[in-house]
Amino acid sequence: MNPIVKQFKYGQHTVTLETGAIARQATAAVMASMDDTTVFVTVVAKKDVKEGQDFFPLTVNYQERTYAAGKIPGGFFKREGRPSEGETLIARLIDRPIRPLFPEGFFNEIQVVATVVSVNPQISPDLVAMIGASAALTLSGVPFNGPIGAARVGFIDNQFVLNPTMAEQKQSRLDLVVAGTDKAVLMVESEADILTEEQMLAAVVFGHQQQQVVIEAVKEFAKEAGKPRWDWVAPQPNTDLINKVKAIAEARLGDAYRITEKQARYEQIDAIKADVIAQITAEDEEISESKIVDIFTALESQIVRGRIIAGEPRIDGRTVDTVRALDICTGVLPRTHGSAIFTRGETQALAVATLGTERDAQIIDELTGERQDHFLFHYNFPPYSVGETGMIGSPKRREIGHGRLAKRGVAAVMPSLAEFPYVVRVVSEITESNGSSSMASVCGASLALMDAGVPIKAAVAGIAMGLVKEEEKFVVLSDILGDEDHLGDMDFKVAGTREGVTALQMDIKIEGITPEIMQIALNQAKSARMHILGVMEQAIPAPRADISDYAPRIYTMKIDPKKIKDVIGKGGATIRSLTEETGTSIDIDDDGTVKIAAVDSNAAKNVMGRIEEIVAEVEAGAIYKGKVTRLADFGAFVAIVGNKEGLVHISQIAEERVEKVSDYLQVGQEVNVKVVEIDRQGRIRLTMKDLAPKQETEINQEDPVEEQE
């Protein structure tokens, strides 16, 4: 084995690419490392196409092995299971920039597998996996129009930082990943702390410029270690079949794409498609339906794109920069903590916000360490939202990705835990969909959070932009429909406040998207966002002053950290009885901060009073009401403030001589006692003699009564 190694500097890190020693039966395999974070990436490509295959079957799998961080998996089976949400998101991050670089008509099955085998807690594996995938595909010889580069851009002290460490990312106002070829940006995924459009674009350009180092290094690596390029030729178009489909369908499709209502339009298009298939297969039974459908779909694209480039109205009759009609309702679900329905044209999201306590936080065990997530965002896309039937079950990759994008859009305006001590969960149920459902989720989430009384810093809105480009002509579209997303050249989603951008996601299917085009798209998106925010502010101008009556209220008090063990009790008995008897939940921090969550304020006050009793200091000379807990021959034990026990000696029970303790006291009896002494070991000596004359008067345990003469 003679491994081939390529090493280069990338920002502050050293990247190493190695091939030829491991997984030699795969089409290509690369061990990619960046400062001890190592990802092993393999590519397997089938030489033959499956019979009847009419799409490109690319699969990207990203998997993290716990041994990479020197850990053993938890759970009963002690091995890795199904992909986590983080693994799914990184698999999508790898997939999105490489998929557009395979030629049209290439239907050979390809599987990319990225396995994290070593991890430096300061270096995130996602970037390493993207670089490794780019290198492996370039070495494999498949018709891949790469390589791609990938860069992470941070923004610290008003300076862009290339590939910041995990520690630096905590100080950064931006987390942006950009991928592209030597000529063009293909993918952007980002989260920002309200930056301007100009700053976001500058970050994209900066990242694309810096990643040229990776692209050049991969090209040099491929010259030395690459396999011969596949002798693949794109299938020749069947001009006779194309002309037949055009003759039957072109005029009718033109009319169908003037129907503004989605379901009616789809019914008409399906009828035309069925007619085209029936007519052509009747003439020649050997022609496959899939080839007819491919030509039919291409014709649809030509019609829609041609009209947009020519300046004609869009599918639903709008101009290029018009946002669909908006409809907003808040407080729609009576027993939830906050809710809203956001409707934009034929896209609708029901967003619901729920407030919880710290124990509801999600504990995420990542390779780079364990962390707690206090803001949860879940996106559901049921089949009925597009008028279809289908499986209902665990979230798919798309739902996880859309949920994360929407969360990124809202995260920047969420209050800190110190400002608002609640765990917040938002669920977006997509009830109708015709494009831009993730951005509808951002708008709906912002409204639901304000309805729940969450003091977000500002309202957030999101908008999806599209692009149609033919040679030098291009048109940027605001608030794209599902069809415009499918038939266009760019999907460009922007979320933000009136002050700036909180999230940007970009997927570009073609080369030639210049910074100038991106700037136009960003400016047009800003205009649309301001319009949407204006309508949202009319519905609910600010967060509600108070949280829902059905939400838990969190009360905070401080105790001496030395007293924490007293509140918890032996084996947790004390705190357990407090929560069970009052229906509250209690969390105690190491610094003595006690957080009590209760729907009923009286229950919370009751618990706070009882905790104050438990932690209260017993004062010598003070009189307390106590309860007899047990009897002995030499006296009685009495629980006073905070269930602290003291001894009333038999000689201190009454003025007269006491022969038998049980003649005077019984277990459970309430008596007034005075603290005579607290010795060095903390033992309390009590007396029932020399008390105030009115025995039955209850003594406030928080304000001990002074000894009376």
Swiss-Prot record:
Classification via InterPro entries: ExoRNase_PH_dom1, ExoRNase_PH_dom2, ExoRNase_PH_dom2_sf, KH_dom, KH_dom_type_1, KH_dom_type_1_sf, NA-bd_OB-fold, PNPase
Keyword annotations of the record: Cytoplasm, Magnesium, Metal-binding, Nucleotidyltransferase, RNA-binding, Transferase
KH domain boundaries: 552-611
SS bond list: none
Catalyzed reactions: RNA(n+1) + phosphate = RNA(n) + a ribonucleoside 5'-diphosphate
N-terminal signal peptide: none
Gene name of the encoded protein: pnp
Name listed for the protein in its UniProt record: Polyribonucleotide nucleotidyltransferase
HAMAP family referenced in this protein's UniProt entry, alphabetically: PNPase
GO MF annotation terms: 3'-5'-RNA exonuclease activity; magnesium ion binding; polyribonucleotide nucleotidyltransferase activity; RNA binding
Cofactor: Mg(2+)
Top-level division of the source organism's lineage: Bacteria
Entry's EC annotation: 2.7.7.8
Uppermost EC category: transferase
SUPFAM superfamilies the record matches: Eukaryotic type KH-domain (KH-domain type I) (SSF54791), Nucleic acid-binding proteins (SSF50249), Ribonuclease PH domain 2-like (SSF55666), Ribosomal protein S5 domain 2-like (SSF54211)
Record-annotated S1 motif domain positions: 621-689
Subcellular location: Cytoplasm
Listed GO biological process terms: mRNA catabolic process; RNA processing
GO cellular component: cytosol
Main localization of the protein described in the UniProt heading: cytoplasm
Organism, scientific name: Haemophilus influenzae (strain 86-028NP)
Subunit comment: Component of the RNA degradosome, which is a multiprotein complex involved in RNA processing and mRNA degradation.
Positions of Mg(2+) binding: 485, 491
Pfam family, one: KH_1
